[in-house]
Amino acid sequence: MQRRLVQQWSVAVFLLSYAVPSCGRSVEGLSRRLKRAVSEHQLLHDKGKSIQDLRRRFFLHHLIAEIHTAEIRATSEVSPNSKPSPNTKNHPVRFGSDDEGRYLTQETNKVETYKEQPLKTPGKKKKGKPGKRKEQEKKKRRTRSAWLDSGVTGSGLEGDHLSDTSTTSLELDSRRH
């Protein structure tokens, strides 16, 4: 008796653990159907969320429209020809527009959006005024010659040494060009 009971249990466990197609469908087909059901649930959830968001927008739009018209009525009753104070902002409020996701919550609703500056095309760099370096070298030579002519001899520097440095600077200048 116990042997027969163990045998029946083992067959039952085997049948339950073995993947058997049910109703002509494979087990993989069943899992696909379950996945489809999950995606359907996600779709319904997203749809419900969007409907709730739309209702919230309509409610806020209606609420702000009442506030906006109440503000206009109050100001028009006070004085019809008065100018608005300069510190008030008159930014247009837009609802339900397609560009709603572009703005952060702390940004104001300005009409103009930020426009990126066009990138500069790489081109030739501007060169300085031609001959500027030569003019600087001439100035240096003039100051040296004025210094030598002023009578600062005996300072330990010889005239030949100074003329050598001016020659080397001229040589360097000619090498650069």
Curated annotation (Swiss-Prot):
Post-translational modification here is noted as: There are 3 principal secretory forms, called PTHrP[1-36], PTHrP[38-94], and osteostatin (PTHrP[107-139]) arising from endoproteolytic cleavage of the initial translation product. Each of these secretory forms is believed to have one or more of its own receptors that mediates the normal paracrine, autocrine and endocrine actions.
Q: Outcome of altering residue 64 to A?
A: Reduced affinity for PTH1R
Q: List the disulfide bonds.
A: none
UniProt-annotated stretches for the region Important for receptor binding: 57-68
Pfam families tied to this protein: Parathyroid (PF01279)
Localization of this protein: Secreted; Cytoplasm; Nucleus
Q: Where is the signal peptide?
A: 1-24
**Propeptide segment residues:** 25-34
Coiled-coil ranges per UniProt: none
| Resulting phenotype, residue 63 to A | Reduced affinity for PTH1R
Q: Which GO terms describe its molecular function?
A: hormone activity; peptide hormone receptor binding
Any one Gene Ontology cellular component term annotated for this protein:
extracellular region
Which InterPro entries does the entry link to? PTH-rel, PTH/PTH-rel
Per the Swiss-Prot or TrEMBL annotation, the motif Nuclear localization signal is positioned at: 108-129
Q: Name one GO biological process term.
A: skeletal system development
* Subunit text: Interacts with PTH1R (via N-terminal extracellular domain).
| Clinical condition linked | Brachydactyly E2: A form of brachydactyly. Brachydactyly defines a group of inherited malformations characterized by shortening of the digits due to abnormal development of the phalanges and/or the metacarpals. Brachydactyly type E is characterized by shortening of the fingers mainly in the metacarpals and metatarsals. Wide variability in the number of digits affected occurs from person to person, even in the same family. Some individuals are moderately short of stature.
- Protein role: Neuroendocrine peptide which is a critical regulator of cellular and organ growth, development, migration, differentiation and survival and of epithelial calcium ion transport. Acts by binding to its receptor, PTH1R, activating G protein-coupled receptor signaling. Regulates endochondral bone development and epithelial-mesenchymal interactions during the formation of the mammary glands and teeth. Required for skeletal homeostasis. Promotes mammary mesenchyme differentiation and bud outgrowth by modulating mesenchymal cell responsiveness to BMPs.
Identify this protein by name. Answer: Parathyroid hormone-related protein
